[in-house]
Amino acid sequence: MVEKVPMTQGGFVKLQEELRWRQQEERPRIIEAIAEARAHGDLSENAEYHAAKEAQSHNEGRITELEDLTARAEVIDLTKMSGDKIKFGAKVKLVDEDTEEEKTYQIVGDQEADVKAGRISISSPIARALIGKEVGDSIEVNAPGGSKAYEILQVSWG
């Protein structure tokens, strides 16, 4: 069975946009760069040609990856999410039990994660610790800097 990749609608749209750009804009640009470099003659010492071929390889690899991700995407409609228990898509407000520092994270798909923007991957240690918990619960997360304890202050959706 094919493993589904959970993501938000916004994350899915971003993947589709990148796929379209790589197929319809980047691919033709690289093909043109290869043709132009090939016209310069000897390919064995043609740095432009080798750079363009490397760019082509990278682009085609990413296209394959994006096609796979979009085919396996399980788009979760966050507008239909609710409840007290934390699951994919939840926005969770936490307080560090040692420093009293408050943080808010939204649990999103791996491709959408951006810690600086407050979006953490569903497969991250903190998200895994949060899943199934609710307001008032405490969690302990083994982070690179050691173990951290958080209390869940708020769970919201959308």
UniProtKB/Swiss-Prot annotation:
PANTHER family, A to Z: TRANSCRIPTION ELONGATION FACTOR GREA
Keywords: DNA-binding, Transcription, Transcription regulation
Record protein name field: Transcription elongation factor GreA
A matching Pfam family: GreA_GreB
Main function: Necessary for efficient RNA polymerase transcription elongation past template-encoded arresting sites. The arresting sites in DNA have the property of trapping a certain fraction of elongating RNA polymerases that pass through, resulting in locked ternary complexes. Cleavage of the nascent transcript by cleavage factors such as GreA or GreB allows the resumption of elongation from the new 3'terminus. GreA releases sequences of 2 to 3 nucleotides.
InterPro entries in the cross-refs: GreA/GreB_C_sf, TF_GreA/GreB_CS, Tscrpt_elong_fac_GreA, Tscrpt_elong_fac_GreA/B, Tscrpt_elong_fac_GreA/B_C, Tscrpt_elong_fac_GreA/B_fam, Tscrpt_elong_fac_GreA/B_N, Tscrpt_elong_fac_GreA/B_N_sf
Family: Belongs to the GreA/GreB family.
MF terms (GO), sorted A to Z: DNA binding; RNA polymerase binding
Originating species: Rhizobium etli (strain ATCC 51251 / DSM 11541 / JCM 21823 / NBRC 15573 / CFN 42)
Tagged with keyword Transcription regulation: yes
GO process terms (BP): DNA-templated transcription elongation; regulation of DNA-templated transcription elongation
Family annotation (NCBIfam families): greA, PRK00226.1-2, PRK00226.1-4, PRK00226.1-5
UniProt-listed PROSITE patterns: GREAB_1, GREAB_2
